């Protein structure tokens, strides 16, 4: 029996939790050619939601393209990956090469098929002649026009997902935003989802002074209902032949901070531990043994992170954990945790947020990794 809980990869349909309303809205908007902004903190299941939406649209006949912007090292590399993804969607090598050459021949792309020793191969696109800023801007206009040409040529809806979209800021973001917005707004048969896991950056990108202001609907992911998540965990355990003790599902959600990634991780690891012993029931004691194992395995990583923090950042992080992320600036919290001036606290909070240790959710600060939160809580200072 395969482990029924999935983490560390895009979650498949049968292991996907809730999000029916968000999924229905995303599928409907993208199928109608909308340009959707999907904003979500890390570990909320954004990428899995996108995958579910693309799969649903693909079954309806749409051509779907999925790119992760942060995986590219430069603007030109991103444009090369973008062109390759559009040209090769449901296309064989010869057809893709001919289509792309005709579509952007003026930019003189180098198009190759690189076979692998194990069979199959990879279609590669390079733009070696894009050497100046003017060349790159011209190239961007040609590449960003490709989805519209593909939709017209195939007479099918095209849907493009650009995950970790906030990473375009590292590619001279303003220029990219202008070029992409200009192309996208002319493509009625192309749906876009611009998805990002850094809410503050994404909110700025759709602000009044940015090209994507009012470009399309905005979908913000919130946490999954505790009750729905608990029901899911209990069903998945039971269906796999392992009976959860009363309270186990609730404990998993609480220990994991109700973060979808962390919930799936803790449930997955607990299932593995119980299965390895040949048991047919998972108990609260089993869960805490699993948690202790995971903390032990992460000890070196967390200790290295801790050593990188300033003394005040350490104190602030511990205060966030002990206060549940609330009222960190209050006089009581400042005195109890010896945090000093409010301005110093704010500087440490900003530094911890920049390092992806904390995230701000409404008035609260939360530790991004629930295991790190538990590790900090268990340390003696």
Can you describe what each PLM-predicted range is?
Residues 2-3, 152, 247, 292, ...:
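C-terminal leucine-rich, beta-strand-based interaction scaffolds used for sensing/assembly
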Residues 230-300:
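Amphipathic alpha-helical "lid/sensor" segments that cap RecA-like P-loop NTPase cores
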Residues 217-228:
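Conserved AAA+ ATPase "SRH/arginine-finger" region at the nucleotide-binding site
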Residues 199-216:
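Short regulatory helix/loop adjacent to the ATP-binding pocket of P-loop NTPases
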Residues 126-198, 207:
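Conserved Walker B catalytic segment
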Residues 41-67:
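P-loop NTPase Walker A phosphate-binding motif
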Residues 1-36, 41, 359:
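A short, basic N-terminal segment
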Residues 58-149:
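Conserved phosphate-binding/catalytic loops and adjacent sensor/switch elements of nucleotide-binding enzymes
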